[in-house]
């Protein structure tokens, strides 16, 4: 009886060990599916006609790669064991593909951040004058080049290759890469926001108390009740910075608090989850605000061509709007997207 009981326990342990990767695979499927739904929701909430910048093209490419990963996982989960182009695919390839994607996503933060920053600087200075079609092709091939370069680096790095090779097909665990780039990028942005807020916290407090949320031209805006400038150049950099902070936090405050928690607690999030479209749009708004700040002396309000933000309406946040009969405009509403 004892021997039989031991054999049963051994069999149950082996069965549990065999089914473990399958449970992880279904969990990965649900996570990627949830991420894709978040991508669709975020892309649907953005302002339209804002596709003429690098970050927009990269966000669309990221959504496509996530969808491609979900399709691969679904096919492998459905067929479980099949041969394609003389290559045998099993459910253990789900972990392998997701690990490769995690490494790729993890190394994309710095290149995307720097490329988007250069793109906004060039567009703001108007040093590049490309036609609409040429600009679309340029962004398209730039995004493709970044993806291919990072993927080639991941597949060609010996340390990454050994890490992937060490995870054999029957491993009970499927560890994923946690990007150090995203942590330091979050730390960098949170510290800059903190220093900027401390520098002009009095102006920010005054603006928040005097600000009005109203509807203008079928759009909900922030209205700053200040007198119009005698010239068409923004002079007070401190007041301008406070308006940028108010506009930024009016949209991204929950995300800023989330980044503070991640930085302080050093939360380890797998790279295939951490690289997402809401995060990219958050970085995008931060970059636009930074470009405005460093070029505030060039902001000509008569002939202004501001980068379009899918979520933050920067123009109505710092340009002195002359709105006649403000009292007759619709009453302020509680839900607002700046």
Swiss-Prot record:
The keyword Cell membrane applies. It is a multi-pass membrane protein. PROSITE patterns: G_PROTEIN_RECEP_F1_2. The keyword Cell membrane applies. Residues 1-23, 80-93, 158-177, 266-268 are extracellular. Glycans are attached at residue 8. It is found in: Cell membrane. Residues 45-58, 115-136, 199-244, 290-338 are cytoplasmic. Signal peptide: none annotated. GO terms for cellular component: plasma membrane; receptor complex. One of its GO terms (molecular function) is G protein-coupled receptor activity. The chain crosses the membrane at residues 24-44, 59-79, 94-114, 137-157, 178-198, 245-265, 269-289. Keywords: Cell membrane, G-protein coupled receptor, Glycoprotein, Membrane, Receptor, Transducer, Transmembrane, Transmembrane helix. InterPro entries: GPCR_Rhodpsn_7TM, GPR160. Its main location: membrane. Belongs to the G-protein coupled receptor 1 family. PANTHER family: G-PROTEIN COUPLED RECEPTOR 160-RELATED. Orphan receptor. This is Probable G-protein coupled receptor 160. It comes from Homo sapiens (Human). The gene is GPR160.
